[in-house]
Swiss-Prot record:
Keywords assigned: ATP-binding, Nucleotide-binding
Protein name: Protein CbxX, chromosomal
Protein role: Seems to be necessary for the expression of RuBisCO.
Record-annotated membrane-spanning stretches: none
Keyword Endoplasmic reticulum applies: no
Family membership: Belongs to the CbxX/CfxQ family.
GO molecular function: ATP binding; ATP hydrolysis activity
InterPro entries the UniProt entry points to: AAA+_ATPase, AAA_lid_6, ATPase_AAA_core, CbxX/CfqX_mono, CbxX/CfxQ, CbxX/CfxQ_RuBisCO_ESX, P-loop_NTPase
Highest taxon in the source lineage: Bacteria
The organism of origin for this protein: Cupriavidus necator (strain ATCC 17699 / DSM 428 / KCTC 22496 / NCIMB 10442 / H16 / Stanier 337)
A Pfam family hit: AAA_lid_6
Upper taxonomic lineage: Bacteria, Pseudomonadati, Pseudomonadota, Betaproteobacteria, Burkholderiales
Length: 317
């Protein structure tokens, strides 16, 4: 009986030692990804699962570069994504940072973000949709195409709707140019689920699904502080407590949009702050006066004219 055949361990092609990266830490430092991830962490409060997924994708691309330097290759991964969540949860901001990370790691050439909706892709008459969609894809090539409320591309109730034509063009480009374009579809989770059920071709091309949770009360307070700091304003102790009360009330009302609603509330507070200073124009202003949002700037909101909920205990992380 002949001896069993043995398989030699996989040996990578030889490469000059000087050309190979050293440790993962060294490769991470030289890639510039650490600062981009840190910037994302500074910009976005909370969202730990989202940040973890972005880090995983960055790690995959970084390790792929190390493998390629040693002669290993599994082919470029498909990185088309779906971001689901309510408005104001950071989907567009994460898409922007994702584009920069992909560029930094050499996955895309330019690293820019092109954000569109159905109206940018779908025409209003025969022969109009294909040129519109192709023009957007041309602009996005080498970067990331972010399609907000992507489910509006598909309208099964209207047989003459041109959205399906845009979808077919997108599918072709997502398959043939996946090494130079990342498409991110975004919207409410339940509607995106129905969209994928009705469009299996699109579902099969989207490998990464990232859910953006709503912010909790404490996170929204931190977001408000961050936004005010960026605008060079501040709360005093009283207005900080009033704004927390404002958020607790506003979160229970219709059309609450997380960080977007926080920004809108702060913008209105700035208007009232400026109006208050103008009404008291004889007073000499100083840095404190010009930068401090007071309780009166917030209490004028119509949110306080409606009854607050009897009890509300925001979920904790």
């Amino acid at each position: 009986m002949s001896a069993p055949e043995t398989t030699a361990p996989l040996q990578p092609p030889a490469a000059p030692a000087a050309s190979l990266p050293g440790s993962l830490a060294e490769s991470l430092a030289s890639s510039g990804i650490t600062e981009l991830l840190a910037q994302l962490d500074r910009e976005l409060i909370g969202l730990k699962p989202v940040k973890a997924r972005i880090r995983d994708i960055a790690a995959l691309l970084l390790v792929d570069k190390l493998r390629a330097a040693r002669g290993f290759s599994a082919g470029a991964p498909s990185l088309h994504m779906c971001f689901t969540g309510n408005p104001g949860t950071g989907k567009t901001t994460v898409a922007m940072r994702m584009a920069q990370i992909l560029h930094q790691l050499g996955y895309v050439r330019r690293g820019h973000l092109v954000a569109v909706t159905r109206d940018d892709l779908v025409g209003q008459y025969i022969g109009h949709t294909a040129p519109k969609t192709k023009e957007i894809l041309k602009k996005a090539m080498g970067g990331v195409l972010f399609i907000d409320e992507a489910y509006y591309l598909y309208r099964p109730e209207n047989e003459r709707d041109y959205g399906q034509e845009a979808i077919e063009i997108l599918l072709q480009v997502m398959e043939n140019n996946r090494d130079d374009l990342v498409v991110i579809l975004a919207g409410y989770k339940d509607r995106m689920d129905r969209f994928f059920e009705s469009n299996p071709g699109m579902s099969s091309r989207v490998a990464h699904h990232v859910d953006f949770p709503d912010y909790q009360l404490d996170e929204l307070r931190q977001i408000a502080d961050l936004m005010l700091s960026e605008m060079q304003y501040r709360f005093d102790d009283e207005s900080r407590a009033v704004f927390a009360d404002y958020l607790a009330r506003r979160m229970t009302q219709p059309h609450f949009a997380n960080a977007r609603s926080v920004r809108n509330a702060l913008d209105r507070a700035r208007l009232r702050h400026a109006s208050r200073l103008l009404d008291d124009a004889g007073t000499v202003v100083d840095d404190h006066t010009l930068t401090t949002i007071t309780a009166s700037d917030l209490l004028a909101s119509r949110v306080f004219s409606k009854a607050a909920p009897d009890a509300r205990t925001p979920a904790k992380e």
